[in-house]
Design a protein with these regions (language model features):
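Conserved GNAT acetyl-CoA-binding A-motif
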Residues: 131-145
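Active-site-proximal loop/turn and secondary-structure-junction residues that shape catalytic pockets
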Residues: 109, 146-148
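Acyl-donor-binding surface of acyltransferase catalytic domains
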Residues: 1-27
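Conserved acetyl-CoA-binding loop-helix of GNAT-fold acetyltransferases
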Residues: 107-112, 116-131
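Loop/helix-junction capping segments adjacent to catalytic residues or to phosphate/diphosphate-binding pockets
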Residues: 40, 117, 149
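A conserved beta-strand-loop-helix scaffold within acyl/acetyltransferase catalytic domains
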Residues: 47-110
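A short beta-loop-alpha structural element at the N-terminal edge
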Residues: 30-42
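Hydrophobic alpha-helical core bundles mediating ligand binding, dimerization, or RNAP-core interactions
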Residues: 43-46, 131
Length: 149
């Protein structure tokens, strides 16, 4: 839920240690990586959670920011319901400015009709599991703001 009445502040969280964890999903849900054609569903999800107001702008952002790097598509995770509809997303974003190897848990979102079921937690755990398997994968950052409570 987005609440723009709350003052905006940049909040950056840092994780220095990732523990092994079991990923638990509610019955009927699964997690998968990006597949060609997911752009429209991601755009609809971003509009449903209030992060975007235009499906076209959201889709363009996804294509330009995330599909421009072919290696990133295996790091884009979606929670899907029993019908295969995308109801959540998270990106295990790895950025390497000046050889620093920054890892970011990025664009975590769950459709309002599917919230409070543990899907966001499962998506975050999926990204963290990927980071944990990688060499030099720490720390992991999460940038957020009070609006997204």
């Amino acid at each position: 839920m987005i609440d723009r009445t709350i003052p905006f502040y940049n909040i950056i969280m840092r994780c220095d240690r990732i523990l092994p964890m079991e990923i638990k999903l509610p019955e009927g849900y699964s997690i998968r990586t990006y597949q060609p054609g997911d752009e429209d569903a991601w755009a609809a999800l971003m509009c449903a959670v209030g992060e975007q107001t235009s499906l076209i702008d959201a889709k363009n952002e996804f294509v330009q920011r995330y599909l421009a790097d072919a290696a990133l598509t295996d790091r884009i995770f979606f929670a899907v319901d029993s019908n295969g509809a995308i109801v959540g997303s998270a990106i295990a974003w790895a950025h390497d400015p000046r050889g620093m190897g920054v890892r970011v848990l990025h664009w975590v979102a769950v459709h309002p009709e599917h919230q409070r079921k543990g899907l966001g937690k499962a998506l975050c755990q999926t990204c963290l599991r990927l980071f944990r398997r990688e060499d030099n994968a720490l720390p992991v950052y999460l940038h957020t703001q009070p609006w997204s409570w």
